[in-house]
Design a protein with these regions (language model features):
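Structured segments of extracytoplasmic/periplasmic soluble domains
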Residues: 8-16, 20, 33-37, 47, ...
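Loop/turn elements at helix/coil->beta-strand transitions in domains of secreted/extracellular proteins
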Residues: 12-16, 36-41, 57-58, 101-103, ...
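Hydrophobic alpha-helical
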Residues: 6-7, 16-36, 122-123, 135-205
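Exported/periplasmic ABC-transporter solute-binding proteins
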Residues: 166, 180-222, 226, 230-248, ...
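Hydrophobic alpha-helical segments within soluble ligand-binding/sensing domains
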Residues: 2, 61-99, 149-150, 200-204, ...
Length: 271
C-alpha cells in the first residue's frame, strides 16, 4: 500500500518525498523508485537502518534519538528516587514492600518498532546501571494506545495489585491509560505506583500538573515538523545545499527534554 502511494506521487512529478516507513527494515523498493526518478527522500519518525540510508546520497532522516528518550526517562526515575531516599535506602513510598528493589511493569508501544525497543532497553539499563535493583513483574505491548493500555492494566491489576511499585511507559498515551485503569479501579493516589511517560503531550502535561503522572520526556514534534519542512523546501528549491552552499545533513535529530511538575508549564506554551 505504501509503495503504491509512493509510486503514484512519483508519477505525479513530486519534487521531494517525505516518508514515514511502515516497515523500517524494508525501504529498498521506495528507494529504488525514487532513485530512478532522481527524487530525494526524507524519511521521518521510523529511522531506517544505516546501510539503507547510505544506499544513495539523496536520502535523509528527520526524527529524534529514541535511545536518549529512554535514558532521560531513566534519569527522571533516578532523580525522584535520590530526592526521596531515606538514609541511603529506597523511599518507602516507592519500595512499599521494603525489599530493596523496585517491582515494575513496562508498557511497550509496538512490537518491532525501533523507538519502542530503544526506549525500553535504555530506561531499564539506565536505572540498573545506577545501582538500583529492578524486578520486572510483566510487560505489555499496548500499541501506543491509551484505551489498549487501560484494558491491559485492568487485566494485570488482579494478579499484581499492590506489588507494582513503578510503571514505565513508552509514551504518554499508554501511561494515561494506566492512570485511567487505576481511576476506574478506585485506587487512591498515594497507593499507586510511580508512573512515567514519554512525549510530553498536552494530556500528559495535564496529568503531571494533577500529580497522577510523575514525569515525562518531551518529544519536540513541532521542531521535527519544522526541520522536515525546511529540508524539503531546500531540496525542492535549491538542491542538496542550503543558501550558503552548506550541504544538508543526512540525519537531523531533535533533542528530548525532561519534564516534571516544576517545569511542565514551559512545554505547555510550546503546544
Amino acid at each position: 500500500m505504501q509503495n503504491e502511494q509512493v509510486e503514484e506521487m512519483l508519477q505525479n512529478s513530486c519534487d521531494v518525498l517525505c516518508v514515514n516507513l511502515v516497515d523500517r527494515t524494508a525501504p529498498s523498493e521506495i528507494i529504488d523508485m525514487a532513485k530512478k526518478k532522481d527524487v530525494p527522500v526524507i524519511f521521518f519518525n521510523r529511522e531506517l537502518v544505516e546501510e539503507d540510508l547510505n544506499q544513495w546520497n539523496k536520502l535523509y532522516y528527520v526524527g529524534a534519538d529514541a535511545k536518549q528518550s529512554g535514558i532521560l526517562q531513566g534519569e527522571l526515575v533516578l532523580e525522584d528516587v535520590k530526592g526521596a531516599e531515606k538514609e541511603g535506602q529506597l523511599p518507602p513510598e516507592l519500595d512499599r514492600n521494603g525489599d530493596g528493589k523496585l517491582q515494575y511493569l513496562i508498557f511497550e508501544g509496538e512490537a518491532g518498532h525501533q523507538d519502542s525497543i530503544m526506549r525500553t532497553d535504555y530506561v531499564v539499563s539506565t536505572i540498573q546501571d545506577a545501582g538500583i535493583p529492578l524486578e520486572r513483574l510483566d510487560y505489555s505491548i499496548a500499541n501506543w494506545s491509551r484505551a489498549e493500555a487501560q484494558s491491559k492494566m485492568m487485566q494485570l491489576y488482579p494478579e499484581f495489585q499492590g506489588k507494582i511499585e513503578l510503571i514505565l511507559s513508552n509514551n504518554d498515551d499508554m501511561a494515561l491509560g494506566v492512570i485511567d485503569a487505576y481511576d476506574k479501579i478506585g485506587v487512591q493516589k498515594d497507593l499507586r505506583p510511580w508512573i512515567y511517560g514519554i512525549d510530553g503531550t498536552k494530556a500528559g502535561l495535564a496529568a503531571i500538573e494533577k500529580g497522577s503522572m510523575r514525569a515525562t520526556v518531551y518529544n519536540d514534534e513541532v521542531g521535527q515538523s519544522k526541520a522536515l519542512f525546511r529540508i524539503a523546501f531546500q531540496l525542492a528549491s535549491e538542491g542538496a545545499e542550503d543558501g550558503e552552499g552548506t550541504e544538508i545533513e543526512k540525519i537531523t535529530r531533535l533533542p528530548y527534554r525532561k519534564v516534571r511538575r516544576k517545569n511542565y508549564a514551559e512545554f505547555r506554551t510550546e503546544e
